[in-house]
Amino acid sequence: AVRSDTVGKPIRGVELKIAKSGEVMYRSVGSFKEYYKNPKATQETKDKDGWVATGDAGYIEETSGQLRIIDRAKDVGKMKNGSMFAPKYVENKLKFFPNILEAVLFGAGQEKCVAFLNIDLSAVGNWAERNNINYASYQELASNEKVIEMMKEHVEEVNQDLAKDTTMSGCQIHRFLILHKELDPDDGEITRTRKVRRSFVSEKYDDLVSALFKGDNEVSTKTEVTYEDGKKGYLEATLTLVDAQTYMLKEKSDAA
């Protein structure tokens, strides 16, 4: 059967395998022989046995044999226990909720995953008005207890979904915080096309990442920001660090 969440099964004459790195490899009589006058590129992409590197990370479902693509291979890492760490996959699940504008997952080389969240000011602001919650700024709304509880529900819903997936269950979010400011291209945190600059964010907010992994309940921080007129300033905040419920792996039969 055709499924929207997988690529499907390989057609006749095509072999698939998953490299130790998590990258999807294929082999077929129809694959290219070599790059024109570029043996180095050929060697980097195709091994001596004819397996071609796709550049994508994924896995083959054990029961259905269908291929599921997770992310670009270069963006996928490993957690401390060797399980796959695919941040964009989890971040996209979080951003499926209209209330979450942006998410950044951390966990490569760690025992567990933690996350930063940006609320969507428009969506959450409308919700706040309907629920008679007053606020004067993004920072004030993001720190509201009811907003934090809403984000916790979203995170735990994603965790429940991840717990159904043998390969991705290790990426459940154990702790999170709502950032006191939106990630901004003017501050170098995201690109103009809204792609998170993960390494930059991790370094800039190292105190917040460390606090999440250490198990602190709150953390005070001071962040340099760029205003609309180009002037620089500082934003101070005390952030609540939230524990999220995680779930045991739920074995399920993949759809046929």
Regions found by a protein language model. Give the residues of each.
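Active-site loops of AMP-binding adenylate-forming
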Residues: A1-T6, N38-A41, L121
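Gly/Ser/Thr-rich phosphate-binding loop
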Residues: A1-V2, E15, L101
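Conserved ATP-binding/catalytic segment of the ANL
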Residues: P10, K17-M79
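Residue-level signal for inorganic ion chemistry
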Residues: L16, L94, A115
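Adenylate-forming
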Residues: S31, Q66-K95, V124-E145, S169-G170, ...
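C-terminal boundary motif of the adenylate-forming
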Residues: G55-A57, F97-A123, L162-A163
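Short Gly/Ser/Thr- and Asp/Glu-enriched loop/turn motifs at secondary-structure junctions
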Residues: R72, A108-K112, G170-H174
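Conserved C-terminal "lid"/linker of ANL adenylate-forming enzymes
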Residues: E102, W127, E156-A255
